[in-house]
Curated annotation (Swiss-Prot):
It comes from Arabidopsis thaliana. The lineage of its organism: Eukaryota, Viridiplantae, Streptophyta, Embryophyta, Tracheophyta. Residues 220-229, 345-357 have a biased composition (Low complexity). Proteolytically cleaved following anther tapetal breakdown. Residues 244-256, 285-301, 328-344, 371-387, 471-492, 518-531 have a biased composition (Basic residues). Residues 201-212, 230-240, 272-283, 315-326, 358-370, 405-416, 440-470, 495-505, 532-543 have a biased composition (Gly residues). PROSITE patterns: OLEOSINS (PS00811). This is Tapetal oleosin GRP-17. Disruption phenotype: Delayed pollen hydration and impaired competitive ability due to a failure to interact with the stigma. Abnormal anther tapetum development.
Amino acid sequence: MSEELSQKPSSAQSLSLREGRNRFPFLSLSQREGRFFPSLSLSERDGRKFSFLSMFSFLMPLLEVIKIIIASVASVIFVGFACVTLAGSAAALVVSTPVFIIFSPVLVPATIATVVLATGFTAGGSFGATALGLIMWLVKRRMGVKPKDNPPPAGLPPNSGAGAGGAQSLIKKSKAKSKGGLKAWCKKMLKSKFGGKKGKSGGGKSKFGGKGGKSEGEEGMSSGDEGMSGSEGGMSGGEGGKSKSGKGKLKAKLEKKKGMSGGSESEEGMSGSEGGMSGGGGSKSKSKKSKLKAKLGKKKGMSGGMSGSEEGMSGSEGGMSSGGGSKSKSKKSKLKAKLGKKKSMSGGMSGSEEGMSGSEGGMSGGGGGKSKSRKSKLKANLGKKKCMSGGMSGSEGGMSRSEGGISGGGMSGGSGSKHKIGGGKHGGLGGKFGKKRGMSGSGGGMSGSEGGVSGSEGSMSGGGMSGGSGSKHKIGGGKHGGLRGKFGKKRGMSGSEGGMSGSEGGMSESGMSGSGGGKHKIGGGKHKFGGGKHGGGGGHMAE
């Protein structure tokens, strides 16, 4: 019965399945394709699962172990990768950070700083070298080194470019004005005072009174001052110099006192050589005056020489009208010749003031000279003190014109010192003292060259050659021509040095006025050949 019962449900199930297939044919289809659709056949899938697990049921206890092993291995691998990555990153950071610091933010600023510093050192060194060169150049100039031995620094802008000469000359002019003005003025004032004292001593040694020597010394200073004003004459100096050779013949007949006044007139010849034809007219009129002076006393002759010298200088820039002015004054000098020493001194010094005003006035200076020649008659009545004060004012007038030529102070001192040499009785002693004074005169010339900066303003040549004339026209004024000829040669060399300094300044008038100075001393001196040699030397040096 139990077997039947056990078989009945199975048969019943089979019957039900069959009925179900017949009733629901899609169910049988789904069951048949259950392997293709396991989601639909839950029972079969569960059965197969259990069958697989039952097959690998021995691996089930190892599943957790496998998970632990896989996790541990993976963790170790990832930790290794992380360590390698972090180590590489740390190494890269350690290496790249110094490289970045060194090469990117430091090297570029360091390079820029190096370039800037190198440029700064280079520029600073060049500026420093230029500054040192300028300082040494200025120190050498102050010490009296010649310009050709003391060239300016090569790095200066005036030495490079087209306008080098103009800029350099402007620099020299400005330095000359700032440097030599007070110095030359002090020297001029001192030499004007000491020149009068030397004139007194020279007058004491001479045959005539000391008063004449004093007036003569003041003449030399006034003529030296005015000789600088006429340094613009140029070639016309030759005519003025030649015209004075005629006076030399007349002066050769005069006595020593007249020779001394002739010496002052030879300074007028130097001014005339610079002034042009007006100097010629002045010299001819003075040759007539020299005849009158030969008859007059020394005081009157000296006063005539002074007035003549200053009158000739008043026409230095005036031209031909100044010649007429000098001739008119030659007539008035006859009236002045009758006056005493005080009157002659006052007239002469007033003439010096007139000469300075005429040199500045140009063509109107001739008229000024003529008009003031009338005033000189009134001034002739003044005392000696007034004329001395006039002399000081005249020297100040010369300094007011020192912008035209600073070297007038130094060279006027030279002419003043040399002008007094001829007053000595003994030619040998006079020659020795002449040598010393000639050296002092050359020193005056050097000071003049410092003041004028070697002819930078064009009037250093007049200073140098006036010193030369001052030395040369004393050769004929002495008794012993041999000794004085030698010393005159040295003085002539100092004059030629003045001419050379003027030629360095680029002023051609210095050379030609020097040659004129040499020519007018040929007839004026006793040693005509010596004078000719000196004159030729002056012309050669000036060229």
